[in-house]
A protein has these predicted regions:
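Positively charged n-region of N-terminal signal peptides that target proteins for export
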Residues: 1-8
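C-terminal motif of bacterial Sec signal peptides marking the signal peptidase cleavage site
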Residues: 13-16
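Compositionally biased intrinsically disordered regions enriched in Thr/Gly
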Residues: 18-273, 282, 286-287, 293, ...
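Acidic, small-residue rich beta-repeat scaffolds with periodic aromatic anchors
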Residues: 30, 34-44, 212-265, 346-504
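Short, hydrophobic/aromatic-rich segments at coil-to-beta transitions
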Residues: 129-135, 324-329, 384-388
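Hydrophobic beta-strand positions in blades of beta-propellers and related beta-sheet-rich domains
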Residues: 153, 291-300, 341-343, 402-404
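Acidic, glycine-anchored loop motifs typical of Ca2+
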Residues: 270-280, 321-328, 385, 425
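A short beta-strand motif characteristic of beta-propeller blades
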Residues: 304-310
Length: 504
């Protein structure tokens, strides 16, 4: 069950629009501009075509949005995102028009009814007042041995909403072909390439695919672009500290702690310890032994850790840099939209899971965007000191509750800021016996008569639950959720309340 603010479909958020920053009318950001993060939201929209009770074509793409505060601060960026959404919808409809006839001609399999489709997925690399940068992977399947796959870089200026040009980030591009040729051949010594430097010299700056993070810019090359399809997507990173004279200083500025979304199935380069040694991180989905679910595998500098217990269908994966240490957060989606939020420690020899938060995911909101339509926008956080997680609880029924978190400086796990969860969805409850309670804030003893309607409000998740009465008073009940059935004041909860509803 999903909480509703008002409207349907999945997505992501960030933090930093509460404090004013100096506005600059110049197209190029100036180095002295105060640094601030930008609250970006992104997520999935879907079109489907059915034939004989089966989906035969599906197109998935992602929509972009700003938080309300950032939308007011960066109206041009908000307009750019809305334009992107409109263009993406138009493209999705065109793909459906092209793919559906192909799908109808194919002989499908009984247990694999989706014959043609396309999916575009965005991974936020950086979002601040200088640049908002996404890596985008687009996969299209029209039959045959393998799908087509291309990668894009989408880079926006928050102030103007315009595309950030490569020539705005680099002060000079004349040596770019030779730099890229050197980096690519050194990184992939066993690969046979097309004539790289000659190929790159024919590229105009705007023809390169690139993204920006807090340590440099990465150039991406789709399959077939500079090598055979089987080689896959290739990349080369030019580091800020490696070619300092090459970069506009405004884009070099970085916070000491940050988060970026990892593109699953792609290797990224990062200097994890700030020691000048370039590290590699690779995350991928691996099928379980039955081929039904996926397992997440994390490889850092050739050492691999795999979660072989918590199977899922999909994962959102984040690199967290905090106090010169590094962690990976994974938010997995499994059956019945059940989530698992895991912390991976990657500071040692082999990546390993150090914490599992069951039923927990990044916070989300359903925003109405038209008559009976809308999008679920999900936080794609980039601020280790401030983010929100939602946890599914089985307390007086199944319900979701959110809490504010920060990354622990001790072990890198999500750390609650105030120890309180606030419920955001779930049904009202009605007492079936008189119940002793405490009336907040003075903790006065009171008794709730039979037939009292209450709305669960807050909990610590283990010892108490606060509920609101029809008169907006808050009462506290003692709970014990260590076993089934849950107990209220030491009494089985189904004896205390009528018709408690739990998810199956």
């Amino acid at each position: 069950m999903k909480k509703i603010l008002c409207g349907l479909i999945v997505v992501g958020m960030i933090s930093g629009c509460s404090d004013p920053i100096l506005q600059n009318e110049s197209e190029k950001p100036e180095p002295e501009k105060a640094f601030a993060l930008v609250d970006v939201m992104s997520g999935n929209a879907v079109l489907e075509d059915w034939h004989e009770n089966n989906v035969i074509t599906r197109v998935i793409w992602q929509k972009l949005k700003l938080s309300e505060a950032c939308g007011e601060k960066y109206p041009a960026l908000l307009d750019a995102f809305e334009k992107y959404n409109e263009e993406s919808l138009t493209e999705a409809k065109a793909q459906m028009y092209e793919l559906t006839p192909l799908a109808k001609e194919m002989e499908g399999e009984e247990y694999n009814p989706v014959y043609c489709g396309a999916e575009a997925k965005l991974y936020l690399q950086r979002a601040d007042n200088h640049i908002v940068s996404f890596f985008e992977g687009v996969e299209t399947y029209t039959g045959g041995i393998h799908p087509d796959y291309v990668v894009n870089g989408r880079n926006y200026s928050p102030e103007t909403g315009a595309e950030v040009k490569l020539t705005e980030v680099l002060t000079d591009t004349k040596d770019l072909p030779s730099i890229l040729e050197k980096k690519i051949t050194e990184k992939y010594p066993g690969v046979t390439f097309f004539e790289l430097e000659d190929t790159f010299s024919k590229y105009k700056p705007e023809e390169f695919t690139w993204t920006a993070d807090y340590q440099g810019i990465t150039f991406w090359f789709s399959p077939y672009e500079i090598a055979a399809y089987a080689v896959g997507t290739l990349s080369a990173k030019i580091w800020f500290d490696e070619y300092p004279e090459l970069f506009n200083k405004a884009y070099v500025e970085a916070p000491s702690d940050y988060v970026m979304t990892l593109p699953v199935g792609h290797e990224i380069e990062f200097d994890l310890e700030g020691d000048g040694v370039k590290d590699t991180i690779y995350t991928e989905k691996r099928l379980d032994q039955y081929g039904s679910y996926n397992m997440l595998s994390v490889t850092v500098n050739g050492k691999t850790g795999t979660d072989e217990i918590n199977y899922a269908y999909d994962f959102d994966v984040y690199l967290v840099h905090m106090d010169d240490k590094n962690y990976i957060y994974s938010d997995s989606t499994s059956d019945n939209d059940y989530h698992m939020f895991c912390t991976w420690d990657i500071n040692g020899d082999t990546p390993k899971i150090t914490q599992e938060l069951y039923g927990t995911e990044m916070d989300y909101h359903f925003v109405e965007e038209g008559y009976e339509t809308g999008t679920v926008y999900k936080q794609a956080f980039n601020h280790p000191e401030s983010f929100v997680l939602e946890t599914r609880f089985d307390i007086l029924g199944t319900r979701g509750a959110t809490a504010a978190y920060q990354v622990s400086k001790t072990d890198g796990t999500p750390e609650m800021k105030d120890g309180v969860y606030t419920f955001n969805y779930g049904h009202e409850v009605t007492t079936s016996i008189p119940l002793e309670a405490e009336l907040l804030p003075d903790m006065e003893k009171t008794e709730l008569p039979v037939g009292t309607s209450l709305t669960p409000y807050q909990t610590d998740g283990k010892s108490y639950v606060d509920l609101k009465t029809k008169e907006e008073q808050i009462v506290r009940l003692a709970i014990d959720e260590s076993d089934w059935p849950r107990k209220v004041n030491g009494i089985p909860e189904d004896e205390c309340f009528e018709n408690l509803m739990y998810a199956g």
